[in-house]
Amino acid sequence: MSVNARYRLLQGGYWMLFCAGYGYVTVFLLAEGFSAGAIGVITALFGIFAAVLQPWLGRLADRGGRLGWKPLLLVLAALGLGDAVLLCLRPPQAVTGVLFGALLMLISAMMPLVNAASFHYRSQGKPVDFGSARGVGSLCYAVLSLVLGQLTARLGGGIVPLAVLGAAALFLLFVLLMPCKPAPAKPKAEPKGDKRRGFLVRYPAFCVMLGASTLMLAFHNITNTYLIQILGAVGGDSADLGVAIALAAVMELPVMFGFSRIARRWSAGSLLTIAGMAFVVKGVWYLMAGSVRGILTAQILQMFSFALFASASVYYAEESMEEQDKVTGQACMSCTITAGAVLGNLVGGWVLDACGVGILLAVALGMAVTGAVLAGVSEKL
């Protein structure tokens, strides 16, 4: 099997795990008796832990040697599998909250390593098409979401840990299948010239884009984590949730599979700015939607919002960073996903409990607008 095919399996397995974890966190924890505010606190707290963990793992991978991306990913995948086994044993509520939060932390920590693998193979002269592999990830996400939506509607949220267990086992298998020649350890050279300056000074546009990305993803996380409540406000249920998530994932496919061509025509920074504007339009659409059909229609905009963001953010880090900072750059961009989850889930849970769905969507729209403006500013730097 070619490296390209194996990498597609890796992305597919990862996004199935992401779907079972992040896609159905609210469905599962609501079924376990948690409030929206408590769910926000759990996801935010462990998101903070993930935000600390991601850059540290990125620096370890950047050093090369034995602690490359694959050994680190194997450890995280094995821990995730063990976590899923414990969840299936139906522990007490408090322990369940901690275990599921830890699972989300591990899933977030895996992302920069999964993305960095494609550039590792390219550096060794093995062509890997990141866009098509990420498209396979979206396709797997869509299929699992449809299946889980139907299962949770019939059997309840308690089925989610079993889905997590199956996805974690598959992902661990796919990590094991990946060939990996360890990169030579990089010598610790004394930085010279502008290398002595801080990250913010060396990469000002990148740092502004990190802020923009965090706000875009705060919007994205609010409208995903609390999508079951958004649908419930217009008469929907968990079966509609499965359809909505799957529709959004399917809408990602044209962009994911065609991104290599798109990237040849536009810079990654420009594409992130376009994604920001699409998040704004999507937010307005959510606010105007008065039915399940309206929410489903808004999901079509996933093609121009998150789909563009997911691919362009990986390329943006690759384009913006010097060679010795590339995996760290990937980790920083992945941190915006975690930081967006912390901000969106924490604020979203509190606003939803206190003010309801309408105000929640207005707050989310404000975040999207601010993120789009910052992305435009970053492009001017």
Sequence positions of predicted segments:
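Juxtamembrane intracellular "pre-TM" segments in multi-pass secondary transporters
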Residues: 1, 179-211, 215
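Helix-loop boundary and gating motifs at the non-cytosolic
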Residues: 1-47, 205-244
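Hydrophobic core of transmembrane alpha-helices in multi-pass small-molecule transporters
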Residues: 12, 93-111, 214, 294-308
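Loop-to-transmembrane helix entry/capping segments in MFS-fold secondary transporters
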Residues: 36-37, 124-136, 238-239, 321-333
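Helix-to-loop junctions at the C-terminal end of transmembrane segments
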Residues: 52-66, 152-153, 255-267, 352-353
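Structural signature of the two symmetry-related core transmembrane helices
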Residues: 70-84, 270-285, 365
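Intracellular juxtamembrane helix-capping segments at the cytosolic ends
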Residues: 108-123, 308-322
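A membrane-interface helix-boundary motif in multi-pass transporters
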Residues: 150-167, 350-368
